[in-house]
């Protein structure tokens, strides 16, 4: 078993408290101070500062003003200050401040400056002549540079970086050529290289060295021509230059104050120069370079050397303890070259002279001291090349204690809504005072039940009895020091805050004002979705314990204001991983889905989503919209978006520690949907369906391993949007871009590449660009050249794909590479309006027309046609290899004049032909996404600039009307075609039915000079006065009633007992029609009935009467063929008596008595008559001659009926029924015409008795 460690832990805890108490009474001092730095603009700078004791708090000053931790581009973490991206506003003097309950001290200044390299002065070519075997001198005026530039030379096309052979690069930047020969003649150019920015600038003109033969013109001091004054830093290497020609270096002497400068010193000879590796202040003086010859001539040049000294303090401050009302003197003796400035500080604040604070030389005098005068005093000496400070502590005694004094008062601060704010207050006193904070609502404590809160943003989701236990204020206090932190500041937190330090001797107060500005002035009010409300209300009504209430919040509330170790060691959450694709199929909505990153040890309270619309062309952006999402959500539905638009999204996660790094995404909405395409639109989930929850990493089917969606994330970020280029200076540009999705890991840096046109290599323009910086300046571009740029995003997984190259950008100015400008311009061959804001044009350019003069690109000019002002022309620049271009940002339904020029360094060509093209009509909501394509502008036949091609004929609003009318007519034609097809189909069905169950046809004769109708008469023995009953055939029945002509009276009455077919029942379903027949009375007393006789044609004999009356023609039949007769006029019939004859009839059939028809026989309906007739034979009953009915009913069928009974035969012959009868004319089918007849006659057949 392990021994009980309880007492040991208690002892350790007591020791820690004692050490803390002792250290809290120690004055702070610095272990390390920040150092000056020179850095390239856009690159990061890191400054370090550390102090003891451990209770000391570190803060920073910039140019004497306190730095806020929320300052843009600056990150402060403990003793480290990081400038994320250096810009001119962040350059200057930085100091760190260490403070505790004793007081505060300030460090020495660290200068942060931007590296830069100036330009050479433009000058004409200088010609220098040097003698052989003598010394040559090439002068160079090195431009200003920070840090000092390295000098290089380009000699006859080759670079010289260091002294080599007979070439010596002097510290001043000049070049000395020893032992000149003919090989040394040629061109010499001086160059300056900045080691920080890696810039190299070359002298534009340079020097030309000529070599001559030796002469006896004496000697000369080539450099320096005049005496020089030098101020150098101590312990630095120094070279005093003296370039002499005409004498050897051994005849050059160096003197200091008239004495030999080399003997007994650390100076040495270097050719004809005097050098030392480390100069001391004792080396200050006058140095002379003396040259003489054998003839006694002497020449000299003098250097006045001044060695500077760092500031120093020979007598510093001492700690003092005085009583109230006494006078205090602090002495500070400073030295240095130049003389340093002396500055006094009290608790890191400069002391301004007053009636109680007086400065007299090296003494600070404080009269009538009060408790507020206690603390730390500093004397700071600074002469520009060095810094020195001395610190002393002032303690004031009052009855073994004194009233608290606020050493560091809280500062006024202005923050944005939602930021993290910290107010600090340090006080001293005996005993150590207790610090309290007061707001406008009174005392602020860290107990959850007494914490002041802002109004809940979703107050309507909570019942009046609910409590908002999310901590808003957090107070961290130590002995004599206290900090008030507001985790997510809101507008309600704005106002005055008071820090009060209290002990038994009294209290002291200090005030600070907190100003809160809205995060964005157009921030939308937060809305609550139904799902959120339902989730908040889904609690057990019976569970009213505090634990169940706390479970509603992700932040754990502690019962006291003491910070737990978990909170102290926690970090800000990582950026969320956005899972949504960069495009959406919806025109006005977007579903943003994400997965939470690492929470840093504290739960995520909320997500803040900012989005705005971007403009693809100009890069202009819309206003930000901000939405707050609860930390438990992982999805947000963005609405009221614009179709076909690009949007940018920034998203951060916030916990109790603070906000994490933002995640960035750009997405594009789809085109607006048409009403006709509603069937293709994706269906929306029904209202009230919960959002898709986040899958727990430990509860999925992959044993706790989260599998990323490879279709959504490949790890590396998406390529940024195409960058936009704007002018920064004559030789530099600003490259601006918009990032896209980060690929699941936050973007750590960007890289910009550039390419000069007509070259194939992409070069790096800037790298390691911080993710918060979306613009960078690219310098040292060649004037007159055309460049393209692209951007690369970098995260933990690697580099993204390269973005689309920017539009070609031409740098101002020309390097005069080509002196001849092109004369003949291009020829515009084709223009077309591709949308309501874009026009595309194509052109041709023949280099031979300009003697193959190289060109750099084309200028495209365009303006509205109705404008006569040349200043209205706008210009697009296109590279020389292009042959087409799209002009954007035009007005809808507007005609434009378009012309072109080609250009190079020498100038522009003449204008091309002018084309006129009109943009399309702006598409209204609901119109087709694919309008009728307009006619393009045909090319002009002339290449003159004044000729104008014909304009296009744009589709206007009337074309839409024509389109609608055409669609309606097309639909009508389609309906008509369907109707005709149905009619044809119905006719075919009827033909099929008639094929298997054909009715009797009514034949119509041909219309000739006369008409003939066959009639049959019955003899007197045929019971003329009788009635004919059962005139009905099983194939169909027709009641034929023909009206007789005037003057003819009588009735043919016949009775067929049992019907025509006694063996048949009336099973017909076909419609039957009655026809009236005329009856005629002749002189012999016979009654004749005019019955249209039907022609049997081919049907002579019948084999099967009952098989649907299908008859077959027999060639050996004894029956004659009766010709088809035509229709007849009712008033012109010739009647003949019928003789009795014996005719075979169909087998007996049964029909209902009294010749009645079935119920479905309609009086006015006539079934179509088939073209082929059958002959059916059967026995029939006797004919009843006693019938007196006026009408005789006959069976309408395809066969002739023949009767044979008791030596009496009655014959029915099928006759032709005229299709023009009044009752049946509309529904009777016309039969094919019969054979032609020569005249109108009536054939009467008499029945013969056998």
Swiss-Prot record:
Domain Fibronectin type-III: residue ranges: 572-673, 719-814, 822-922
Keywords: Cell membrane, Disulfide bond, Glycoprotein, Immunoglobulin domain, Membrane, Repeat, Signal, Transmembrane, Transmembrane helix
Tissue expression per record: Highly expressed in somites and the dorsal lips of the neural tube during embryogenesis. Detected at very low levels in adult tissues.
Skewed-composition ranges (Basic and acidic residues): 1193-1208
Mode of membrane association: Single-pass membrane protein
Pfam families per the UniProt record, alphabetical: fn3, I-set, Ig_3
CDD domains: FN3, Ig
Region listing for Disordered, in residue ranges: 524-547, 929-951, 1178-1208, 1223-1250
Coiled coil feature spans: none
Residues in compartment: Extracellular: 25-962
One cellular component term from this protein's GO annotations in UniProt: plasma membrane
Entry protein name: Cell adhesion molecule-related/down-regulated by oncogenes
Organism: Mus musculus
Gene: Cdon
């Amino acid at each position: 078993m392990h021994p009980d460690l309880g007492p040991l832990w208690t002892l350790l805890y007591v020791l820690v408290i004692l050490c803390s108490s002792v250290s809290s009474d120690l004055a702070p001092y610095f272990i390390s101070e920040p150092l000056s730095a020179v850095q390239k603009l856009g690159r990061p700078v890191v400054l370090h500062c550390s102090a003891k004791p451990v209770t000391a708090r570190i803060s920073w000053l910039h140019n004497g003003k306190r730095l806020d931790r929320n300052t843009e581009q600056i990150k402060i973490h403990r003793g480290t200050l990081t400038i994320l991206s250096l810009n001119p506003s962040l350059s200057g003097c930085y100091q760190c401040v260490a403070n505790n309950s004793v007081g505060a001290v300030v460090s020495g200044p660290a200068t942060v400056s931007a590296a830069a390299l100036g330009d050479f002065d433009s000058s004409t070519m200088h010609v220098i002549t040097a003698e052989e075997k003598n010394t040559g001198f090439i002068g160079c005026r090195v431009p200003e540079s920070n840090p000092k530039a390295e000098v290089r030379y380009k000699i006859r096309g080759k670079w010289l970086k260091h002294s080599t052979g007979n070439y010596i690069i002097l510290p001043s930047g000049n070049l000395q050529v020893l032992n000149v020969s003919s090989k040394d003649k040629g061109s010499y150019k001086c160059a300056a290289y900045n080691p920080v920015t890696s810039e190299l600038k070359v002298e534009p003109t340079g020097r030309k060295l000529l070599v001559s033969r030796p002469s006896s013109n004496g000697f000369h001091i080539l450099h320096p021509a005049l005496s020089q004054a030098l101020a150098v830093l101590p312990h630095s290497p120094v070279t005093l230059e003296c370039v002499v020609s005409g004498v050897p270096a051994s005849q050059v002497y160096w003197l200091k104050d008239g004495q030999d400068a080399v003997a007994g010193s650390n100076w040495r000879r270097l050719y004809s120069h005097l050098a030392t590796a480390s100069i001391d202040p004792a080396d200050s003086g006058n140095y002379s370079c003396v040259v003489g010859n054998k003839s006694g001539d002497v020449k000299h040049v003098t250097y006045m050397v001044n060695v500077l000294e760092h500031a120093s303090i020979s007598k510093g401050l001492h700690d003092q303890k005085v009583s109230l009302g006494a006078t205090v003197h602090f002495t500070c003796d400073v030295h240095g070259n130049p003389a340093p400035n002396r500055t006094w500080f009290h608790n890191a604040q400069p002391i301004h002279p007053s009636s109680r604070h007086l400065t007299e030389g090296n003494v600070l005098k404080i009269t009538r001291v009060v408790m507020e005068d206690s603390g730390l005093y500093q004397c700071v000496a600074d002469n520009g090349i060095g810094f020195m400070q001395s610190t002393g502590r002032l303690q004031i005694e009052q009855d073994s204690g004194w009233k608290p004094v606020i050493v560091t008062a809280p500062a006024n601060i202005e923050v944005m809504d939602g930021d993290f704010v910290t107010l600090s207050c340090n006080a001293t006193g005996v005993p150590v005072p207790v610090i309290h904070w007061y707001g406008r609502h009174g005392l602020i404590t860290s107990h959850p039940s007494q914490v002041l809160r802002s109004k809940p943003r979703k107050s309507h989701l909570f019942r009046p009895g609910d409590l908002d236990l999310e901590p808003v204020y957090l107070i961290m206090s130590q002995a004599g020091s206290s900090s008030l932190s507001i985790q997510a500041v809101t507008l309600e937190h704005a106002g005055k805050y008071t820090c009060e330090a209290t002990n038994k001797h009294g209290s002291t107060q200090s005030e600070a004002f907190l100003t809160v500005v809205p995060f964005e002035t157009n921030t939308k009010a937060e809305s609550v979705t139904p799902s959120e409300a339902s989730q908040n209300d889904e609690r057990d009504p019976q569970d009213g314990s505090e634990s169940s209430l706390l479970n509603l919040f992700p932040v754990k509330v502690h019962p006291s204001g003491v910070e737990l170790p978990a909170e102290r060691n926690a970090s800000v959450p990582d950026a969320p991983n956005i899972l949504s694709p960069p495009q959406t199929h919806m025109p006005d909505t977007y579903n943003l889905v994400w997965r939470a990153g690492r929470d840093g040890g504290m739960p995520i309270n909320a997500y803040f989503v900012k989005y705005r619309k971007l403009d693809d062309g100009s890069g202009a952006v819309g206003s930000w919209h901000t939405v707050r999402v609860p930390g438990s959500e992982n999805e947000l539905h963005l609405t009221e978006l614009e179709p076909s638009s690009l949007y940018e999204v920034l998203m951060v996660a916030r916990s109790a520690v603070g906000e994490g790094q933002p995640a960035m995404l750009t997405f594009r909405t789809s085109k607006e949907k048409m009403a006709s395409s509603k069937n293709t639109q994706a269906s929306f989930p029904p209202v009230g369906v919960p959002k898709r929850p986040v899958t727990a990493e430990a509860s999925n089917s992959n044993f706790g391993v989260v599998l990323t969606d490879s279709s959504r994330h490949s790890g590396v970020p998406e390529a940024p949007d195409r960058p936009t280029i704007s002018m920064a200076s004559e030789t530099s540009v600003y490259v601006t871009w918009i990032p896209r999705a980060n690929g699941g890991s936050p973007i750590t840096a960007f890289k910009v590449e550039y390419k000069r046109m007509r070259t194939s290599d992409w070069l790096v323009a800037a790298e390691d660009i911080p993710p918060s910086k979306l613009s960078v300046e690219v310098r040292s571009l060649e004037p007159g050249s055309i460049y393209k740029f692209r951007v690369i995003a970098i995260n933990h997984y690697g580099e993204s794909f390269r973005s689309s190259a920017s539009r070609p950008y031409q740098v101002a100015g020309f390097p005069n590479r080509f002196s001849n400008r092109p004369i003949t311009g291009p020829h515009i061959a084709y223009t077309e309006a591709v949308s309501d804001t874009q026009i595309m044009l194509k052109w041709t350019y023949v280099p031979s027309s300009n003697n193959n003069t190289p060109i750099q690109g084309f200028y495209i000019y365009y303006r509205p046609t109705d404008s006569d002002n040349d200043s209205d022309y706008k210009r697009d620049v296109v590279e020389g290899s292009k042959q087409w271009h799209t002009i954007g940002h035009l007005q809808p339904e507007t005609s434009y004049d378009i012309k072109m020029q080609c250009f190079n360094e020498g100038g522009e060509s003449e204008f091309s032909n002018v084309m006129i093209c009109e943009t399309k009509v702006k598409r209204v909501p609901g119109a087709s996404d694919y309008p009728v394509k307009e006619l393009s502008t045909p090319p002009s036949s002339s290449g003159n600039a004044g000729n104008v091609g014909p304009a296009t004929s744009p589709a206007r609003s009337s074309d839409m009307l024509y389109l609608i009318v055409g669609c309606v007519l097309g639909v009508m034609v389609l309906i008509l075609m369907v109707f005709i097809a149905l009619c044809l189909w119905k006719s075919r069905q009827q033909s099929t039915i008639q094929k298997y169950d054909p009715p009797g046809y009514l034949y119509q004769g041909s219309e000739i000079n006369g008409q003939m109708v066959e009639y049959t008469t019955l003899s007197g023995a045929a019971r003329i006065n009788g009635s004919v009953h059962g005139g009905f055939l099983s194939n169909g029945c027709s009641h034929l009633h023909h009206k007789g002509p005037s003057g003819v009276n009588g009735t043919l009455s016949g009775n067929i007992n049992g019907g025509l077919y006694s063996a048949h029942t009336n099973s017909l379903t076909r419609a039957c029609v009655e026809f009236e027949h005329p009856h005629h009375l002749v002189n012999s007393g016979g009654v004749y009935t005019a019955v249209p006789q039907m022609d049997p044609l081919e049907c002579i004999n019948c084999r099967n009467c009952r098989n649907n009356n299908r008859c077959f023609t027999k060639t050996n039949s004894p029956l004659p063929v009766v010709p088809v007769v035509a229709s007849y006029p009712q008033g012109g019939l010739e009647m003949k008596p019928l003789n009795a004859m014996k005719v075979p009839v169909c087998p007996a059939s049964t029909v209902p008595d009294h010749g009645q028809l079935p119920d479905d026989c309609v009086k006015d309906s006539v079934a179509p008559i088939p073209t082929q007739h059958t002959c059916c034979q059967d026995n029939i009953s006797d004919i009843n001659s006693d019938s007196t009915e006026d009408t005789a009913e006959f069976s309408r069928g395809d066969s002739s009926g023949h009767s044979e009974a008791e030596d009496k035969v009655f014959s029915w012959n099928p006759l032709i029924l005229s299709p023009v009868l009044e009752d049946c004319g509309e529904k009777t089918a016309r039969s094919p015409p019969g054979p032609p007849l020569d005249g109108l006659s009536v054939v009467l057949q008499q029945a013969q008795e056998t």
